[in-house]
């Protein structure tokens, strides 16, 4: 179900990758400025790619799960680098092909959760925003000695 929300913005890209890198991959008219429209299109495309995997989740989300913000930035970075003439490093390629795609597949299969309640609001989770649960064989308890 499409919802047309974008999970990240240019500020998120700069915070994650630095202004210089974003400039290198998103200055299409070579004026020394980040082309905000180029970044916006890349982030919208990245969000649409994410949504293709998240069909089982109720959308739009009340809040953007932090993990989706990171995934959107990684996808946009990969796509912008591929179209900018800048060399795609192994780190950029692996973040997309291994980290992003594998996590999206795991989310779509229900192997990991976004940490949202039934209304789509964020619940307390780990820093990544992804919840891993295992109820078997508890090792530690409050009363353990």
Regions found by a protein language model. Give the residues of each.
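Core structural elements
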Residues: 67-78
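Conserved short "hinge" loops at termini or chain/domain junctions
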Residues: 1-68, 126-145
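Short loop/turn elements at secondary-structure junctions
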Residues: 78-145
